[in-house]
Amino acid sequence: MEMASRQIVAFGGGGFSMESGNPLLDDYVLGLTRAERPRVCFLPSASGDADHDIVRFYRAFSAHRCEPSHISLFRREQGPSDLRRHLLSQDLIYVGGGSVVSLLGVWRAHGIDSILREA
């Protein structure tokens, strides 16, 4: 299968975090990966790794349609230990909404900003 080109899809609102009964936006971004079972990592950093956002993500991106994961930067005892390796292995990196100031600060502290530029 041909590898999808790298791209950024940005949207404000919608998707699993705002429209739990409407999978159209989530289906669209999954389809962009062109992978049969895309690896999808959720970064809930902007919401301070809010549990309700993580639960909604796993409900929307269930294991039967993709391989979901998330990275909690405010609770590093959870999730993958090698952030770079994990993020670079993903077909889709889904960044959740919230405070951009908080997001940028915690990303810089953990090197996520540099990893995402590389992805």
Where are these regions (language model features)?
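Hydrophobic N-terminal alpha-helices or hydrophobic patches in metabolic proteins across all domains
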Residues: 1-119
